[in-house]
């Protein structure tokens, strides 16, 4: 199993179980009315930070911020009931 798939499975489990102290649980419950808002806010924030790191040509910061962005996108996908395999299928479809 690849590391992104493993991370995705952990995220799904934390969304389901909502363990105390879990950052994923916090993201998915921070805004009781519309939980997606906090997740979308974080995706936007991390996207901006990734862009700034790229513009600054700071390789280490770009790697760090890209990992943050990918993590938050995985949370967004999992919270919306999208499976990792569905994302991979879309990548496969685009290769043709």
UniProtKB/Swiss-Prot annotation:
Keyword Hydrolase among UniProt keywords: yes
Reaction(s) catalysed by this chain's protein: 1-(5-phospho-beta-D-ribosyl)-ATP + H2O = 1-(5-phospho-beta-D-ribosyl)-5'-AMP + diphosphate + H(+)
Organism: Methanococcus aeolicus (strain ATCC BAA-1280 / DSM 17508 / OCM 812 / Nankai-3)
Predominant place of localization: cytoplasm
Pathway: Amino-acid biosynthesis; L-histidine biosynthesis; L-histidine from 5-phospho-alpha-D-ribose 1-diphosphate: step 2/9
GO molecular function, a single term: phosphoribosyl-ATP diphosphatase activity
Protein keywords: Amino-acid biosynthesis, ATP-binding, Cytoplasm, Histidine biosynthesis, Hydrolase, Nucleotide-binding
Residues making up the signal peptide according to the UniProt record: none
Protein name listed in UniProt: Phosphoribosyl-ATP pyrophosphatase
GO cellular component, one term: cytoplasm
Subcellular location: Cytoplasm
Upper taxonomic lineage: Archaea, Methanobacteriati, Methanobacteriota, Methanomada group, Methanococci
Family: Belongs to the PRA-PH family.
């Amino acid at each position: 199993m690849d590391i992104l798939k493993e991370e995705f499975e952990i995220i799904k489990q934390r969304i389901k179980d909502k363990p105390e102290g879990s950052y994923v649980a916090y993201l998915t419950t921070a805004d009781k009315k519309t939980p997606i808002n906090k997740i979308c806010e974080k995706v936007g924030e991390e996207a901006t930070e990734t862009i700034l790191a790229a513009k600054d040509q700071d390789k280490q910061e770009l790697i760090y911020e890209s990992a943050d962005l990918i993590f938050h996108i995985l949370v967004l996908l999992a919270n919306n009931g999208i499976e990792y395999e569905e994302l991979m299928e879309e990548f496969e479809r685009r290769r043709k």
